[in-house]
């Protein structure tokens, strides 16, 4: 705050669901400790930890926090869904648990603080690790998650069409129509048309 003054700055942190996905779902060697034999207890503790983190950022002067989350991009990918299913995971059930966990984390969010979510399919050296439209997670995430807005990757056909946006409630949506993966600029008129299409 002493540096930013009255300028609204955005801080980004991994979403609670990323913590769980990386440690407990992707990691095939994960074995729950005794306290977390019931996964609901772990979801709860992660959410409470995030409540404290959100408050700490607020007390430090942060009024705009973004949750970075690539787990939802994975949940859109048909091949990844198949792989997780073969390992015994029900991704729809996990997705509902993630939304509940995020909503619990946001329960103590002060009114004058904005929390948004950024969803993408990865971007490391202009490559990605998942593909697929938002339809598999749209109703669960867009229809029930209490963030103030979504930043959604829509820079290629890998992201599907705009129909999943029908589940958006009162949140703001930022469409990621400009790619960082290639040096060529998009045509301005094409970008305008895509925005109109999304409306």
Task: Kindly label every feature range from the protein language model.
Residues 1-199:
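Domain-level signal for soluble alpha/beta catalytic cores
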């Amino acid at each position: 705050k002493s540096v930013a003054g009255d300028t609204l700055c955005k801080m980004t942190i991994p979403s609670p669901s990323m913590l769980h996905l990386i440690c407990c779902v992707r990691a095939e060697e994960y074995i729950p400790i005794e306290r977390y034999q019931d996964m609901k207890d772990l979801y709860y503790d992660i959410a409470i930890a995030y409540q404290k983190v959100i408050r700490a950022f607020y007390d430090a002067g942060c009024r705009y926090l973004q949750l970075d989350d690539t787990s939802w991009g994975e949940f859109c990918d048909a091949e990844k869904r198949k792989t997780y299913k073969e390992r015994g995971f029900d991704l729809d059930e996990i997705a509902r648990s993630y939304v509940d966990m995020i909503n619990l984390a946001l329960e103590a969010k002060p009114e004058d603080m904005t929390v948004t979510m950024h969803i993408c399919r990865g971007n490391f050296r202009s490559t990605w690790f998942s593909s697929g439209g938002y339809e598999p997670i749209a109703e669960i995430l867009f229809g029930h998650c209490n963030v103030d807005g979504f930043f959604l990757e829509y820079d290629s056909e890998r992201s599907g069409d705009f129909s999943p946006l029908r589940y958006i409630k009162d949140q703001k949506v930022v469409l990621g129509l400009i790619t960082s993966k290639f040096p060529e600029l998009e045509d301005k008129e094409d970008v305008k048309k895509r925005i109109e299409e999304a409306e």
